[in-house]
Amino acid sequence: MVSKRQRVLLEVIQELINNNIRSRVYLFKSLFLLDKEYGLNIGFDFHPYKFGPYSIVIDREINKLIKNNYIRKEGNFYKVNKCGKLSNDSIKQIINKFKSQRQILEYVYENYPFFASRSEKIARKKEQIKKGLFDIGYEKKSIDLFISLLLINNINCLIDVRYNAFSMNFDYTKKKLKKYLNDRGVEYLHLKELGINGSLRKSLELEEDYKLLFKNYKKSLKYKQELLNIVISKSKEEGTAIMCFEKDNKFCHRGVIAKELTRQGIGVTAI
């Protein structure tokens, strides 16, 4: 059985084929506009990449559809093996709105300039490097939303302060995350020594448990100034973010790091 977003994906691919359009670029831009302008909330986030708005998750869903024989590769596009009747008129409207791939690209680039900021199709202006320090948690964030937040805040270096750079969401495992970021011009650093060993987190239940853990962690930071200096140095060179899991930094040791760096005169902005 296909999910709601897989169903929409199938229908968009089929409607493109019906209109003799076989273009991945057109596919991604159509899905982007369905979300932004037609309110078709299908659970995809986007970030700026080589040809405008792109989604890692969409490509993953396409691969699932291929694996389950709903679609198959045909040249540079796809052939639909299984698809029901078109269930949303918005899909037909968005595809019929543009006469060519160039037209839909120009429309997206003009109306959503942030998503065109990394495009290979337009000349990129040399931007002044923006410096500063941020903190971010990836909890409940798709990898596409996470990357988008980094780029919109002009972050060029991500410092991972997890003890173990592993996640049940495999997009945030060290190897994958580093590749995603490097491909988009963002440096990745893993400062394991600024993390907290997972064994110390096992019994955390109450707010008091967190307070005790972070109280002890704060004491340990006086022995880790060399590592903090790396963070400080990076933030003075370019936009830099420290990252861990928790959405709210009050429940994450990166919040303790942020407070310590603020005490040392380095402002930290939470994303």
Locate each region found by the language model.
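Short, surface-exposed acidic-centric catalytic microdomains
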Residues: 168-208
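Domain-edge interaction signal
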Residues: 1-139, 152, 262-263, 267
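A conditional alpha-helix N-cap/helix-loop micro-motif detector
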Residues: 139-143, 170, 220-228
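Acidic beta-strand-to-loop metal/phosphate-binding motif
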Residues: 157-164, 239-247
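Acidic, metal-coordinating catalytic cores used for nucleic-acid/nucleotide bond scission
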Residues: 50-54, 164-174, 195-197, 246-253
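Internal catalytic-core helix/loop-beta-alpha segment
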Residues: 206-241, 251
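Short Gly/Thr/Asp-enriched flexible loops that form oxyanion-binding sites at enzyme active sites
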Residues: 251-262
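A short beta-strand-loop structural module common to alpha/beta enzyme folds
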Residues: 157-167, 190-194, 270-271
